[in-house]
Amino acid sequence: MLLPRIPQLSHATRAAYVAAKSPFSPVPVRPFHASAALRAIDMAKVDTTHRLAELRKLMKERNVDIYMVPSEDSHQSEYIAPCDARRAYISGFTGSAGYAVITHEKAALSTDGRYFNQAEKQLDSNWELLKQGIQDVPTIQQWTADQAGGGKVVGVDPSVVTAGDARKLAEKIKKKGGEYKAIDENLVDLVWGSERPARPSEKVIVQPKKYAGKGFEDKIDDLRKELEKKKSLGFVVSMLDEVAWLFNLRGSDIPYNPVFFSYAVVTPTTATLYVDENKLPEDVKEHLGDKITIRPYEAIFGDVTALSKELFEANDKNETQKKFLTSNTASWALNKALGGDDKVEETRSPVGDSKAVKNEVELEGMRQCHIRDGAALSEYFAWLEDQLINKKATLDEVDGADKLEEIRKKHDMFMGLSFDTISSTGANAAVIHYKPEKGECATIDSKAIYLCDSGAQYRDGTTDTTRTLHFTEPTEMERKAYTLVLKGNMALERVKFPKGTTGFALDALARQFLWAEGLDYRHGTGHGVGSFLNVHEGPIGIGTRVQYSEVSLAVGNVVSDEPGYYEDGKFGIRIENMVMVKEVETKHKFGDKPYLGFEHVTMTPYCRNLVDMKLLTEDEKKFINDYHKEVYEKTSKYFDKDALTLEWLKRETAPY
């Protein structure tokens, strides 16, 4: 699953879930994804007149002239729970990216090009749509600052914006003569009232050491060593996947991501987990033992205020200047609770850095889950071809996505999807962030490109694979584009590079063959992936984002390799493999540096029908043949009683 080259606002999520019982834990756990029955988007306008009137009353009572409603939750999560979908509630717009700002006379909603059509359908007459990226249309920050002139107060819930973003916007507003102010109560929550969904309270499960590879005690010890190096008083863990990883726990509070609502505070002598205790079964409490203090989720702000005061007083007596560490994604509210910028040092999260370097157990888990997942994808593609070509079936894009999920569910340790499947036919495949919706999506066309970007959560790893197929006769341009993308995918996978190289530096390798033809794609080439955690994981990645120039790739990183090519209104192509960074042998070691390379773990054939053999070198053909041989050897055992898939797999993996 790709990340856009230009950073987008955080994704919102579906507003409902389906209860289910996981066979892999002793307690009921919801799936990590929205039900297929809930995929349809209601495009009807919501009358927001009353909601806005109530919000403006609250604004007036609190002397707020302008109120900002971002998409994010308190943890800057990519996906959010229904109770945190405040922007969707106040505006009626349910797209995954957007920012709402309300004044006493106006209301504006900013979103990007993926959602212009949806926003126009869903926003009522109370709202002005700011089309992000269109010439002469201001950003929501610029629009807000312009409205703040003349001493107006701009309010925001400080728990849903980062401290860094708050500083930047406060400066813009100040230059216009306004004031940016933290409003501790979330005013949209007050308007929402009793209709607001409850915060999820699903049970937490243990991620055993046989999957995690390392005990949580050792992880906390490693974090304390980092605190000692930085001479820090402690670290506040605010990202949900970081808390889950640090304590070897998983949850199901957020769709697609096996995390739970929580914070953690680690000091040189204490470790406290902030979570609703009723979410912790006895086995989880036994797992944590007496080394971890459990405190209520809501107690975090009061506790860090008291703790920071206590530690800073002791710090003053020692006449040493130490600060609390927070990640650069921590909220403004946490920053304020800890005493503000003078007492807080923002940094790239040391927990996030450690999490991105998988240990040998996690790496082996990634290998194994990708074999099972590859078998599921081959079964799906064989079934789909048979349905379309032999049975002349009529299937829409969601039918395909649902069938793939059904097949994945049969495999060991399946826990849910890792994101909503992108099942796209023809022109829809050219929409980079396409999401099929029942009742709105297209019928799969056997005479057109079919792009499937999908992934799953397993107890031993997280998968994300994209394959592009054609079931009949592709055009010459489709074959050429596919082969150029495939060449770029292979070039990146096969590169050897010195330790210290960044994903920013490697990005061009995947684009080189497209560039030679004057072609390109408008998204990043790769993103980090968690181990039974979030499918998008920082801080590493491959692309032109500034952050990818700041962090070098390291042994144990798992990252996607997914170049593509898209022609609007016609077709789209993307090929995505998951690769792991490993040390490699080279004849020389310039500067005595180790050299690194990639190991592929994705086990799904490329599409023979789309490969233009004339564009491949003999070396590239050998690479594909070796890969296909490995795919067949590792996945064919799943099809002893499935002649259809086995024949398809033999055909697709036959030597060139």
Curated annotation (Swiss-Prot):
Keywords for the protein's UniProt record, in alphabetical order: Aminopeptidase, Hydrolase, Manganese, Metal-binding, Metalloprotease, Protease
GO MF entries: metal ion binding; metalloaminopeptidase activity
Enzyme Commission no: 3.4.11.9
InterPro entries: Creatin/AminoP/Spt16_N, Creatinase/aminopeptidase-like, Creatinase_N, Pept_M24, Pept_M24B, Peptidase_M24_C, Peptidase_M24B_aminopep-P_CS, X-Pro_aminopeptidase_P
One Pfam family this sequence matches: Creatinase_N_2
Co-factor requirement: Mn(2+)
GO cellular component: cytoplasm
Binding, Mn(2+) 1: D464, E562, E576
Entry annotated with the keyword Glycoprotein: no
Protein name (record): Probable Xaa-Pro aminopeptidase P
Gene: ampp
